[in-house]
């Protein structure tokens, strides 16, 4: 009976946590872009580099990403969008994952991991998942490693040392 109780509690917790993740709608994009800029500003300040592409992205560009892929949002219990991730599949069945963001006040609570799990689940026909992150973001590198991504190579992109990872 105790085992069933433990199983049931874990199962219910998993259902509850995933109700926070859903596909973004077009009217969410303004809030997601704002969250993106807030999240990447922390990185920009650490690097003293304020022209990072995620900080410069505009509404038209995020709308294009919305049209060509999937954008997920993580909604807190009080209805605020506090996390997001994007994915799109190319013609070679590679899923390109990008812009995993979590509001600074909500980091280190498992939200990034949940978003990664869910975006991968939504692309069952992909044989490879690919992403890149800045070398100066060790916490992000650690998260991606924990969820199964391996470093493929390093390259300079727009003056930033980037790490390409795949799963």
Identify the function of each model-found stretch.
Residues 19-34:
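A short beta-loop-alpha structural element at the N-terminal edge
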Residues 34-62:
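Conserved GNAT-fold acetyl-CoA-binding loop/helix
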Residues 61-73:
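A short helix-loop-beta-strand connector motif used in the catalytic cores of GNAT acetyltransferases and
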Residues 73, 80-89, 96-101:
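Conserved beta-strand in the GNAT
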Residues 100-107, 133-135:
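A short, internal acetyl-CoA/4′-phosphopantetheine-binding micro-motif in the GNAT/acyltransferase core
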Residues 106, 110-118:
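Conserved acetyl-CoA pyrophosphate-binding loop and the N-cap/start of the following alpha-helix
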Residues 113-114, 121, 136-153:
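Conserved active-site alpha-helix within GNAT-family acetyltransferase domains
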Residues 122-133:
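Conserved GNAT acetyl-CoA-binding A-motif
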